Structures are given as structure tokens and as C-alpha cells.
Amino acid sequence: MNTAALREQIQRAHQHEAETGQLLQQLKIQLPHLHPAIHLPEVDAQGALTRFVTAYIDLVPDLLDAAHEVAIEAGIEGQIRPVLRIAEHFFTAPPDIMQGHEGLDSLLDEAYLAHRLVEEVNDLYIKHFGQPLIPSNTTVASVIAHQVIGEQFANQLDEAVHHAVDQLLDDEDFALDSVEAYREKLSSPDTEAAWKRWPSLSRQLGIGLELERSAG
């Protein structure tokens, strides 16, 4: 995985945002129109939403590195790597539907694609192993990102994700001998220790989850 290039791209987008304030202005416009299910702090709601979007984008390289490493341990790197490469490709060569988007605004769309792709792979792992590829539940964060991006465009991005997964993964990929060996290894005490190598995932998503927990 060439996540170093992704990190550089994200850094450039942060610089673009520092110079233009483009994302901040966009979120300011969107804030009054967000779905009522999304509860933001009464104080500095715009700042909280901006921090959430930034954390959601910044998390992608770590997420892809984690997914790749665990896929190697599972003996299914050959099946998972192409999916992760698509997530990476969403950043380096975005689909045509994202033309005209730039800076952190563009990377939010691309981060959404990457997160949703990993979520779909996680769902397959849960189906076949009873637990996800990586122990990071980004579903709540992606629901919020979906609303920030906008229903119509986010639905188009979801379609791109489903198409990618359908093309690259099926049940036969989880019937390999190496996968059976991994399934047995999941009951090992070492597995829980392995999950704990990625504590920053949930911490970085804390903003997104806090946004939801503040409801009520």
C-alpha cells in the first residue's frame, strides 16, 4: 500500500484549506441543512463539524494500512489488496463524478469512498468469520459524512463502492485453506492483542461518535 502518497496528498489539502478556508465556508452553508438526527454541540458546532471531517479524512491511510496488515495475517491479501488499492485509487485518481472538487472538500468525498469500501469488506469478514477485518466501526462516522456530502451525491459514491466490491470479492474467496487457518486463529488470545495495535482508529473517530452520543 502506498499510503505515504495519500498522507502527502492529505497534507497538501490541509495547506489548501489553510490558504482558502474553502471547506470551512462550505460547512458553514451546510450546517443549517444537516439532517436533524445529527446533533452537534451548541457551542462551536461549525468547529466540531470541521474537526470531524478532518479526522475522518486523516484516518484513511491508517485504516488502509491496518486492513492490509490484517489481510496478510488472514492469508487473504491476494483477495483484499485489490479492494484496498481501489480505495487508494479513489484518492490518486478520483472518479469523473468528482470533477471540480478540490482540497479537503474533494478528500471528504474520497475518504467516504475509502471508509465505505473498508466497511463493505468488514461486513464480508463478519459474515464469514463472525468479526470484522479490523475492529473499527466507522458506520456512524460515515452516516454523518453521507449527510455532509449530500444525499444524492453520496448515494452515487455508494454505488461506486458496491460495484467495486461485487467485482472483486465473492464467497469463494473466503473458502481458501489459508482462510480456514485464519478462522481457527481468531480464537487465539494473540488475536485480541493484535487488534490493540490500532487504538488510534477509535480515538480519531471519537468526534464522529461524540456527535451521535450528544443526541438527547
What are these regions (language model features)?
Residues 82, 86-116:
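Membrane-inserting effector segments that mediate pore formation, membrane fusion
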Residues 113, 123-124:
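Hydrophobic alpha-helical segments
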Residues 1-82, 119, 126-216:
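Terminal, membrane-proximal amphipathic helices
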